[in-house]
């Protein structure tokens, strides 16, 4: 009897496992309808759910999807050639939509004037229709359909622009840049404020690690030829042909760490190892032009203006990140719905 009970338990467990696996397989075999796909969530921002349909009809994305469908055919999600790029592009657009939903949510707390927003949105929509469609409502609707977007998506797009601007004004209203900050920036970036455009003639050896760069520096300090070392060790693809000789180049054409190091060198001097996104450089300055700098007072206001815009963007982006945490933005569990 005990043996029979054990067998019954085993049979029940096996039957349950079989039924469960069949139900899972069945779920995977069922194709979602276009309507179900459109309603699939791709992100949640507070209480607001962004759906796949809203994402795919977002004007910038919709136009690109239409072009890709013309080029690669109907179901882009099954095209291995472009799948990764499609996911990346959609994720970028979704991030933009998330930011917009955050701004919509917070605009109520900040008491943004809705009547003013609506008036500005209607004005922008009219300009868009007049300039792109000569005010022809039927052509407007027809072309939006061809683009894969909707009137509702276009209106939301313009509304997001207006509300973002209004919210941003409130967030960054206290941001200031004083003369001292501008002066500090001028001194640190002096070579971007030159009357002429001086060039620098340099040779370098590029290696992967700081330790390797230190060894290169030691060999150069002992008098070894940089051309010989560049041909031997440099990971710069052009080094085999040019022996590390970069020719003459202006400050603006160099990556910043390299440029900042080279301006401190005198002719014939060799730098300490310099890290950039390419690796570690050891640089020898062959020659450089004489340089004349613009007077600080002549560029002060432009510097302040540029720094102010940069600081405003920084403050606004930080606020968005703060709000994102407050609203518990969720995208991870909806990743499978993005394509």
Curated annotation (Swiss-Prot):
Name the Pfam families on file.
Rotamase_3, SurA_N_3
Q: What Gene3D superfamilies does the record point to?
A: 3.10.50.40, Porin chaperone SurA, peptide-binding domain
One Gene Ontology term of the biological-process aspect is: protein folding
Q: Which reaction does it catalyse?
A: [protein]-peptidylproline (omega=180) = [protein]-peptidylproline (omega=0)
Q: Which SUPFAM superfamilies match?
A: FKBP-like, Triger factor/SurA peptide-binding domain-like
GO MF terms held by the record: peptidyl-prolyl cis-trans isomerase activity
Signal peptide: which range, if any? 1-26
Q: What is its main location?
A: membrane
Boundaries of every PpiC domain copy: 197-287
Enzyme class, spelled out: isomerase
Q: Which UniProt keywords apply?
A: Cell membrane, Isomerase, Lipoprotein, Membrane, Palmitate, Rotamase, Signal
A Gene Ontology CC term for this entry?
Answer: plasma membrane
Lipid modification (S-diacylglycerol cysteine), residues: 27
What EC number(s) would the UniProt record show?
5.2.1.8
- Please give, as recorded in its UniProt entry, the membrane topology of this protein: Lipid-anchor
Localization, UniProt: Cell membrane
Q: Where is the lipid attached (N-palmitoyl cysteine)?
A: 27
> Main role?
Plays a major role in protein secretion by helping the post-translocational extracellular folding of several secreted proteins.
Q: Which HAMAP family does the UniProt record give?
A: Foldase_PrsA
What family does this belong to? Belongs to the PrsA family.
Q: What is this protein called?
A: Foldase protein PrsA
